[in-house]
């Protein structure tokens, strides 16, 4: 039994006219009659009564019409969904992100992606970098937005999607709070609150590398697993820290960000997926995100600092 036979049958069942149906589906009337005859042979019953004056459905034809219409609708839906899935426009995306990009970068991309891919379902989770790496490698996460750098021996394909400067973060009552720019040597010997290495080793080592290059050994009074918590610790007077500028901008804590005059690396967010064969929906989202974030970067004004 072929789909074209069922479609032809349903069209005749609606028009009750072989000639009119043949015109509608752009098929010769003899060819249409052959399709229906083959369908009746497969069903094992006559579906139409025909004479010179009219065409009508038999009892078998009425029963077949109702079920065939429902079956055809389901099959056409299955075909449509299969094509969407093959083109990366259907499926579920499990996305992880570090807290500092969860409120801005990820929601914007997801919202824009859903406009042209409404049948993709999302599961969004705030996950620390080290756990994201493990989940991506095990296949329990599809896309991760994490802190760079990630180890070169990783089984992940990582692309930098966001860059911003590090700033020195001090309490609003600190002696440097009124300074717009500082050199790191000016804070040598002061207490620092720092990021724990376990949860983002590459990012932790990057921060300590900044101090090492400035020939400073920070006196660490407290550690935290998330950067927003570091900012809160700074506000409470536990110490000072360095952090990405956007974290301070989005914080309500009573802290001040001072630009760092030393030549230091930028803070980077990477978008990570597993290397190798991936679900089409993952590749579709990744390509869309790279294009979208690329346009956003190109539209930003030049940094004049």
Describe the role of every protein-language-model region.
Residues 105, 194, 248, 255-305:
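A late-sequence structural motif
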Residues 147, 180, 190-214, 279-287, ...:
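Secondary-structure junction motif
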Residues 90-153, 224:
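Central regulatory/effector-binding core of bacterial HTH transcription factors
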Residues 12-28, 54:
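Short helix-boundary/capping micro-motifs
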Residues 39-40, 113:
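Conserved amphipathic alpha-helical core elements
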Residues 40-57:
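A short LG(V/I)-centered, amphipathic sequence patch enriched
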